[in-house]
Amino acid sequence: MKTTAWTIGDIHGIGPEIILKTFDESLRSTGQPEEKPIVIGSAEALLYYSKRLGLSIDIRTIDAPEKAAAYPQGVLPVISVGEPSSPLQPGTISAEAGRLSMLAIEKAANLCLEGRCAAMVTAPIHKEAVARAGYPHTGHTDFLADLCATDNPTMLFRDPVSGLMVALATIHVALHRVPELIRSMDMSAFFSNLNRSLQSDFRIEQPRIAVLGLNPHASDGGVMGREEKEIILPCIDALADRQNIEGPFAADGFFGSGKYRNYDVTVAMYHDQGLLPFKVLAFDTGINVTLGLPLVRTSPDHGTSFDIAGQGRASHRSFSEAAKLAWEIAFNRLMEHS
């Protein structure tokens, strides 16, 4: 299978550090990196952080992913999308760092769409740095949707330790907009696409899907909102003969009682409804997967952590798990179409 592309993220955050630690750990544990990666970003930034971390990784610049095969397993190949014009300043917001992080994503996505890379794993970007660079996007998900000309990709979060998976019906939007988006979205298509992705990407033959309500107590029969009765429940009923889907459940009791363990995936109506319990349960190991794209993309479920950038304190566990999952999903898709 082809190589995976790891994007460097914001060069003033922990992205370069967790990439280097993941690569170094893989070399020390197996003698070779399992995912056979290339890094898309800045060779200078990787060399800078490698020195700060006291690592002796052999970093080489290449101009095409196919050239990575010519190097020994211990070499970390890098495709540069640009180099910083001034000394690196870990923990600071920079338009240049934002621009380089987005250029890396664009390059990796294009390599995947061209069939030259099997998957992409993205290190964290900083939203303010991206905005300063002139990009209107709020994160990876909507940027990749534009690059892939795809409508409404799904954010899914997975904990490889417990198996917990949470999908979001809406993503990075202000809370006051959630009800209108729930009413305007094609919820039936959302659930059908989610079901299909779980089958193809995770090899779950009959996914068990739990759906949370939007309102407190799932509105208690319409006392605290009408979205459950008018939108969510009719959609679940219409799909029940084709999918293993149940709900809507009150979010607090659902997670508090551990009922989520009875399902393959839980669908939350908005960002914090799903991510708050997920991060409590899987802060160090959680992975973000973007479903509904014509490419495989995973990422660690954390941000740039500017407060510890460049200090050698960042945990690479989530990125390492994201790299493993990207390889697994790419393999599953390859087998499905072989």
UniProtKB/Swiss-Prot annotation:
Catalysed transformations (reactions): 4-(phosphooxy)-L-threonine + NAD(+) = 3-amino-2-oxopropyl phosphate + CO2 + NADH
Q: Name one Pfam family in it.
A: PdxA
What GO terms in the biological process aspect are recorded for it?
pyridoxine biosynthetic process
**Cofactor details (free text):** Binds 1 divalent metal cation per subunit.
Key words, A-Z: Cytoplasm, Metal-binding, NAD, NADP, Oxidoreductase, Pyridoxine biosynthesis
Question: What S-S linkages are listed for this chain?
Answer: none
Q: Indicate where this protein is primarily found.
A: cytoplasm
For the ligand (a divalent metal cation), the binding residues are: H172, H217, H271
- Matching InterPro entries: PdxA_fam
- Positions binding substrate in this chain are H140, T141, K279, N288, R297
Recorded metabolic or biological pathway in which this protein acts: Cofactor biosynthesis; pyridoxine 5'-phosphate biosynthesis; pyridoxine 5'-phosphate from D-erythrose 4-phosphate: step 4/5
Tell me one GO molecular function of this protein.
Answer: metal ion binding
What are the subcellular locations of this protein? Cytoplasm
Cofactor(s) needed by this chain: a divalent metal cation
EC number annotated for this UniProt entry: 1.1.1.262
Q: Which GO terms describe its cellular component?
A: cytoplasm
Other comments?
The active site is located at the dimer interface.
- What does the UniProt record say this protein does? Catalyzes the NAD(P)-dependent oxidation of 4-(phosphooxy)-L-threonine (HTP) into 2-amino-3-oxo-4-(phosphooxy)butyric acid which spontaneously decarboxylates to form 3-amino-2-oxopropyl phosphate (AHAP).
- Known partners and oligomeric status: Homodimer.
Give the family, as the similarity comment puts it. Belongs to the PdxA family.
Q: Which NCBIfam families match?
A: pdxA (TIGR00557)
* Protein name listed in UniProt: 4-hydroxythreonine-4-phosphate dehydrogenase
Protein source organism: Prosthecochloris aestuarii (strain DSM 271 / SK 413)
